[in-house]
Amino acid sequence: MTTQEILNILQSDIHSVVFATLDEHGLPQTCVIDLMLADDDGLYFLTAKGKAFYRRLMAKPFVSISGMKGGDTLSTTAISVRGAVRSIGTKRLAEIFEKNPYMVKIYPTEKSREALEVFQLYKGQGEYFDLAQLPPYRQSFSFGGERIQENGYRIIPEKCIGCQ
């Protein structure tokens, strides 16, 4: 599976993911944020400038995100990404609203949208983990010039004995 396919699954199939950032005391904070776009240059999301999440992103522009889909454990696909983010202002805001029409209900006027700022996760690395197939499928990936760092163990499907 290509990195772009994985990012597309994260953005379109999972969409709402948990973001972890660090606060001003270096303590972890999490929140659920929708991924609005995915392309060859990374993942895009937005937040309002008055939120604590915005302040954390501006102060320490690194995130770790995780998302999953599936009805039960053996139908679950999980994707995690960690990397660097940057504000791109209102660039791509119109495209975000076009591709995510539910946003119009949340921010119905141009005036209400002035509070929003778009962020790009532009380089990072991550892992795709699929328990819907047995043995489980695991793949590391990277983008934006980052290198893949293998973590944990590696499952070699043809040598898997099914945890016996």
PLM segments and residue spans:
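Ferredoxin-like iron-sulfur electron-transfer modules
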Residues: 144-164
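A short, Trp-centered hydrophobic/proline-enriched beta-strand micro-motif
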Residues: 9-25, 63-67
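Short, structured beta-strand-loop surface elements
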Residues: 52-125
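A short, well-structured catalytic beta-strand-centered motif of the EAL phosphodiesterase domain
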Residues: 32-37
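Flexible glycine-rich active-site/ligand-binding loops centered on an Asp-His dyad
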Residues: 118, 133-151
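Short active-site oxyanion
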Residues: 40-44, 158
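Charged, amphipathic alpha-helical segments
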Residues: 1-5, 50-51, 105
